[in-house]
């Protein structure tokens, strides 16, 4: 592609005033027709893979999509002009419940609804003025894409990373499907807000826990501290010991991070789902325990972990303390989770808040074994637990040892010698619950044969495609289960009758590896063409922090498995991640139709043009923070672009003549260029816009100075034109061609900073007489005090206010102020 290919045959005269609607559609068509933004991997320049999180095709791009995309688009454009070979693709995350629910509502197929939305949103992205390479577009609901979801799943299964088991799961009664722990927010479905129930079902899981420790290592990826903290907390690594207690149902092992408090254990607590609850419950306690277990089963893990009054019930049985031999009552309580540790705990109420609250509620013993330095002890009726470090007391052979980290290793070693404990590391992270009981997702590529059991579909039969004529009404079973023709098949092992797996995959599978598919979206020999691996990893990935423990964690896990499969040498999918903030409603609340505070970007484009909307969204707030929408604020960028147009094309500028020199203009241009470069590096987009606005003001002044029309002026316009290109691409392209330039401004070279011009040799400072400003003077930065004062005294206004007075003091602060005090 040549630069000349992007130059249109423009016959019409130039508009006297800036008219975005006359130029934006024209240039969008020219760019698309010429293939201006198509990525050529063989083009010169260092590769840079820039990627924004792909959207769900819900119908229309909202203002949040614009906010998330225009700033990274501007940065990608800037990199391209600097000589990088930039890959900037886009696709659609197309599977999911909204499409299925829309199909139910509109009596259509989810595919029909989804592909219509994709076509509409693709056009909206183009009207945004992005440099997206649409030749790499795909939708995750394309069979050519989800074929590789199925291939991956079988490969995971071969490696022992995919398995099926029964157990308690989160269930959304509205969406009629299971949810992963990460999809439950405060006890409610993160998508529809319905209170989540617990059900016992046989489900598919992916063994993400095998990678828990490696997922805590962020050394190969540059992620914001908040994202690292969220993932670290979600993985929940705990280092401690497993201690074994004898019970009437056999040995019971508990996990503790504080083995130094072992002698403070005064009771044991089991999770309601613990396998030994039934055996440990005495006949006298059975009815009460069974009722409690049933009630706990109706709560989610999140609800059980919330602060509130503790509940529980005594089983009637006792455990034997492994050191003291004391009998500890065994209770059942829902604040203990069967999924954490072993599902049972040794309760140390003197040194744990939850155990303390439970002991107080049920009048159980509290035994102090860690005493704070300088403390006289808790006494018989402690008011609160002590969870800090200190000195071990009331613990026999351990007395006098320091509590906490300083002694834990030594205590574990002693307990191991006695055969009652062993060192152990646990993680709160649970395996990824992977199956869903809905239609619009990737079919799980397994069949069930009564003779051969569960078998994977052979690779040459992939993809297992979704059937088209299916009843979508949710019943609690997958709609695929109701399609007898589709689910009836043959066993790949024995050739006998078999039934397809009718659950579909969690749609987060689609976004776990999609960044690899962009490398070769039409490749049919694997998930991606291995010869394109040199484009990896994604150099800059941008998107919302709300994905920190879902998409971002899953994609890191997926890449590590791909590495172990030999598909990539990378351990992380993204070299660098940055999160944008959120554009809120004018009222400061999250935008929603119910609140009536939604801003439609299409309306804004129709009124102001895409470049104005782009500039305003970059200017409105620091990009990483976001903020409330300001309906009046967009007028500022709109007026600014009109002034930009006038700088280039208005022949006469009203106002007094300015005394700017060539050095002044070059300083304004090159210092602005230097700052814009720094701000693009830092992703400080709001200050980029403000710097360009300041430069516009300087050039308006320069147009009223002797510099106007000189080579310095022409250089200034050329550099300014290029500086505009990344942030307001349409007006920059129009200006480029109206000025007679060849090719496209977007393939032009980014200007070089003249470091000498970007630094002033002189400084302008205010001159005061007795504290009141009476003028200003331009002097050398290295001027002496006498030189500065001499220049100040030469100002007519200063002389006027000194006339007839006696100077009593002269103050000179270099680079800042001159003050002559007179009486």
Curated annotation (Swiss-Prot):
The keyword Acetylation does not apply. GO terms for molecular function: aminoacyl-tRNA deacylase activity; ATP binding; leucine-tRNA ligase activity. It is found in: Cytoplasm. ATP binds at residue 593. The keyword Signal does not apply. Transmembrane segments: none annotated. One of its GO terms (cellular component) is cytosol. It comes from the Bacteria. One of its GO terms (biological process) is leucyl-tRNA aminoacylation. Its EC number is 6.1.1.4. It catalyses: tRNA(Leu) + L-leucine + ATP = L-leucyl-tRNA(Leu) + AMP + diphosphate. Coiled coil: none annotated. A motif ('HIGH' region) lies at residues 55-65. Keywords: Aminoacyl-tRNA synthetase, ATP-binding, Cytoplasm, Ligase, Nucleotide-binding, Protein biosynthesis. A motif ('KMSKS' region) lies at residues 590-594. Its main location: cytoplasm. Belongs to the class-I aminoacyl-tRNA synthetase family. This is Leucine--tRNA ligase. The lineage of its organism: Bacteria, Thermotogati, Deinococcota, Deinococci, Deinococcales. The gene is leuS.
């Amino acid at each position: 592609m040549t630069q000349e290919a992007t130059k249109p045959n423009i016959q019409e005269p130039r508009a006297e005033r800036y008219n975005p609607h006359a130029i934006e559609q024209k240039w969008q068509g020219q760019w698309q027709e010429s293939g201006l933004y198509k990525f050529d991997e063989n083009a010169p320049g260092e590769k840079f893979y820039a990627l924004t999180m792909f959207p769900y095709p819900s119908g229309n791009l909202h203002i949040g999509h614009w906010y998330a995309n225009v700033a990274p688009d501007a940065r990608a454009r800037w990199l391209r002009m600097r000589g990088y070979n930039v890959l900037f693709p886009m696709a659609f995350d197309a599977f999911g419940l909204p499409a299925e629910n829309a199909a139910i509502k509109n009596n259509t197929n989810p595919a029909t609804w989804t592909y219509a939305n994709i076509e509409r949103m693709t056009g909206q992205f183009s009207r945004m003025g992005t440099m997206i390479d649409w030749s790499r577009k795909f939708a995750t609901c394309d069979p050519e894409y989800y074929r590789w979801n199925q291939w991956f799943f079988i490969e995971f299964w071969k490696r022992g990373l995919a398995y099926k088991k029964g157990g308690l799961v989160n269930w959304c009664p509205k969406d009629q499907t299971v949810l992963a722990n990460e999809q439950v927010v405060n006890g409610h479905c993160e998508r529809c807000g319905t209170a989540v129930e617990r059900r016992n079902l046989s489900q598919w899981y992916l063994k993400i826990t095998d990678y828990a420790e490696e997922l805590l290592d962020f050394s190969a990826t540059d992620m914001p501290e908040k994202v690292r903290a969220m993932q670290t907390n979600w993985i929940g690594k705990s280092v401690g010991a497993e201690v074994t207690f004898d019970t009437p149902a056999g040995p019971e092992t508990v996990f503790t991070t504080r083995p130094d408090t072992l002698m403070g254990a005064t009771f044991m607590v089991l999770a309601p789902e613990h396998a030994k609850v039934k055996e440990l419950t005495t006949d006298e306690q059975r009815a009460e325990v069974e009722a409690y277990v049933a009630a706990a089963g109706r709560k989610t893990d999140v609800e059980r972990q919330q602060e509130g009054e503790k509940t529980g019930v005594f089983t009637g049985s006792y455990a034997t303390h492994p050191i003291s031999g004391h009998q500890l009552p065994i209770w059942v309580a829902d604040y203990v989770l069967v999924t954490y540790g072993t599902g049972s705990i040794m309760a140390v109420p003197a040194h744990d808040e939850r155990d303390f609250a439970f002991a107080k509620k049920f009048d159980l013993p509290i035994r102090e074994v860690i005493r704070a330095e300088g403390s006289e002890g808790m006494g018989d009726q402690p008011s609160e637990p002590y969870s800090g470090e200190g000195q071990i007391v009331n613990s026999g052979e351990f007395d006098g040892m320091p509590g906490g980290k300083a002694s834990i290793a030594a205590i574990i070693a002693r307990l191991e010698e006695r055969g009652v404990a062993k060192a152990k590391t646990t993680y709160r992270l649970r395996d990824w619950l992977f199956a869903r009981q809905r239609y619009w997702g990737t079919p799980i590529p397994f069949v069930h044969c009564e003779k051969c059991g569960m078998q994977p579909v052979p690779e040459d039969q992939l993809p297992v495609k979704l059937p088209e004529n299916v009843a979508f009404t949710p019943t609690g079973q997958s709609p695929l289960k109701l399609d007898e023709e589709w689910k009836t098949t043959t066993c790949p092992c024995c050739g006998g009758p078999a039934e397809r797996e009718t659950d579909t995959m969690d749609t987060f599978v689609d976004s776990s590896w999609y960044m690899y598919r962009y490398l070769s979206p039409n490749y049919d020999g694997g998930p991606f063409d291995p010869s394109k691996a040199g484009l990896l990893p994604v150099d800059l990935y941008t998107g919302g922090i709300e994905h920190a423990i879902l998409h971002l964690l899953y994609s890191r896990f997926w890449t590590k498995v791909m590495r172990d499969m030999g598909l990539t040498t990378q351990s992380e999918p993204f070299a660098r991640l940055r999160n944008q903030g959120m554009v809120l409603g004018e009222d400061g609340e999250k935008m929603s139709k119910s609140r009536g505070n939604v801003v439609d970007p299409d309306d804004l484009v129709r009124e102001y043009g895409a470049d104005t909307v782009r500039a305003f969204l970059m200017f409105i707030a620091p990009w990483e923070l976001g903020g409330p929408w300001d309906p009046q604020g967009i007028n500022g960028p709109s007026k600014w672009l009109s002034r930009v147009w006038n700088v280039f094309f208005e022949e006469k500028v009203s106002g007094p003549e300015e005394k700017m020199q060539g050095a002044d203009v070059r300083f304004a241009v090159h210092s602005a260029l230097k700052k814009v470069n720094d701000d693009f590096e830092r992703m400080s987009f709001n200050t980029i816009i403000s710097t360009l606005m300041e430069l516009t003001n300087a050039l308006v002044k320069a147009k009223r100075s002797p510099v106007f029309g000189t080579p310095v002026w022409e250089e200034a316009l050329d550099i300014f034109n290029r500086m505009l290109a990344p942030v307001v691409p349409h007006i920059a392209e129009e200006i480029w061609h109206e000025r007679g330039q060849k090719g496209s401004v977007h393939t032009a070279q980014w200007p070089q900073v003249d470091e000498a011009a970007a630094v002033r040799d002189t400084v302008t400072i205010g001159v005061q007489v007795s504290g009141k400003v009476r003028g200003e003077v331009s002097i050398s930065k290295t001027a002496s005090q006498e030189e500065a004062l001499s220049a100040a005294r030469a100002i007519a206004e200063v002389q006027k206010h000194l006339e007839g007075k006696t100077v009593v003091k002269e103050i000179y602060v270099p680079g800042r102020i001159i003050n002559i005090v007179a009486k």
